């Protein structure tokens, strides 16, 4: 069944294949275009560098008018990521726009890894360490980067 949301997701997938952004990838799951599996590679020059982080993206039939639900499947230690892997990012909530596509969602999350917003913490411990003890924060991030290799 072809719906506007499904047609849009096919376009998003085609665009992602034809013009893949650096450091991110994503594709619909085998039997459901409404559920995607994605990977974000830790940005170079950040504590997340060399990490391989898996995510799931779940769309509704209201996409692109409503944002998808995006969660890290890989363990994540970040000020803006909840314990269940869900992400506190304005474009996935109140600043969503139908002009955003899968590519822009993934690159925005990749940018968030490097530039957390400690004023809107989903993980207060990570936010506190990020602001007050960068060395310990980076140590904790290194541990999840190493764990991401085992999870691949």
UniProtKB/Swiss-Prot annotation:
Keyword DNA-binding: no
Keyword Nucleus: no
PROSITE patterns: UBC_1 (PS00183), UBC_2 (PS50127)
Post-translational modification: Phosphorylation at Ser-120 by CDK9 increases activity towards histone H2B.
GO molecular function list: ATP binding; ubiquitin binding; ubiquitin conjugating enzyme activity; ubiquitin protein ligase binding; ubiquitin-protein transferase activity
Catalytic activity: S-ubiquitinyl-[E1 ubiquitin-activating enzyme]-L-cysteine + [E2 ubiquitin-conjugating enzyme]-L-cysteine = [E1 ubiquitin-activating enzyme]-L-cysteine + S-ubiquitinyl-[E2 ubiquitin-conjugating enzyme]-L-cysteine
Single GO cellular component term: cytosol
Outcome of mutating residue 7 to W: In MRXSN; decreased mitophagy
Consequence the record notes for mutating residue 8 to A: Impaired ability to transfer ubiquitin to UBR4
Domain UBC core: 4-150
Effect on the protein upon substituting residue 120 to A: Abolished ability to transfer ubiquitin to UBR4
Active-site residues, record numbering mapped to chain: 88 (glycyl thioester intermediate)
Pathway(s) of this molecule: Protein modification; protein ubiquitination
Keyword entries, A-Z: ATP-binding, Chromatin regulator, Disease variant, DNA damage, DNA repair, Endosome, Intellectual disability, Lysosome, Nucleotide-binding, Phosphoprotein, Transferase, Ubl conjugation pathway
Cellular location(s): Late endosome; Lysosome
Phosphoserine: residues carrying this PTM: 120
EC number(s) given by UniProt: 2.3.2.23
Xref: CDD domains: UBCc_UBE2A_2B (cd23790)
Xref: InterPro entries: Ub_conjugating_enzyme, UBQ-conjugat_E2_core, UBQ-conjugating_AS, UBQ-conjugating_enzyme/RWD
GO biological process: chromatin remodeling; DNA repair; G2/M transition of mitotic cell cycle; positive regulation of mitophagy; postreplication repair; proteasome-mediated ubiquitin-dependent protein catabolic process; protein K11-linked ubiquitination; protein K48-linked ubiquitination
Family to which this protein belongs: Belongs to the ubiquitin-conjugating enzyme family.
Function: E2 ubiquitin-conjugating enzyme that accepts ubiquitin from the ubiquitin-activating enzyme E1 and transfers it to a E3 ubiquitin-protein ligase. In vitro catalyzes 'Lys-11', as well as 'Lys-48'-linked polyubiquitination. Together with the E3 enzyme BRE1 (RNF20 and/or RNF40), plays a role in transcription regulation by catalyzing the monoubiquitination of histone H2B at 'Lys-120' to form H2BK120ub1. H2BK120ub1 gives a specific tag for epigenetic transcriptional activation, elongation by RNA polymerase II, telomeric silencing, and is also a prerequisite for H3K4me and H3K79me formation.
Subunit description: Interacts with RAD18 and WAC. Interacts with RFPL4A and CCNB1.
Recorded disease: Intellectual developmental disorder, X-linked, syndromic, Nascimento-type: A disorder characterized by significantly below average general intellectual functioning associated with impairments in adaptive behavior and manifested during the developmental period. MRXSN features include dysmorphic facies, hirsutism, skin and nails abnormalities, obesity, speech anomalies and seizures.
Protein name: Ubiquitin-conjugating enzyme E2 A
Species this protein is from: Homo sapiens (Human)
Higher taxonomy: Eukaryota, Metazoa, Chordata, Craniata, Vertebrata
């Amino acid at each position: 069944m072809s719906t506007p949301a499904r047609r849009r997701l096919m376009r998003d997938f085609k665009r992602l294949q034809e013009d893949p952004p650096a450091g991110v990838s994503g594709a619909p799951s085998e039997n459901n275009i409404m559920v995607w599996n994605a990977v974000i590679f830790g940005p170079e020059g950040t504590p997340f560098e060399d990490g391989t982080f898996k995510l799931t993206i779940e769309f509704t039939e209201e996409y692109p008018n409503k944002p998808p639900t995006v969660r890290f499947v890989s363990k994540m230690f970040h000020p803006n990521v909840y314990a269940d892997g869900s992400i506190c990012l304005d474009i996935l909530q109140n600043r969503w726009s139908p002009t955003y596509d899968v590519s822009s969602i993934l690159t925005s999350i990749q940018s968030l890894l490097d530039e957390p917003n400690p004023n809107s913490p989903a993980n207060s411990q990570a936010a506190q360490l990020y602001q007050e003890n960068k060395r310990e924060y980076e140590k904790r991030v290194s541990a999840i980067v190493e764990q991401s290799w085992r999870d691949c």
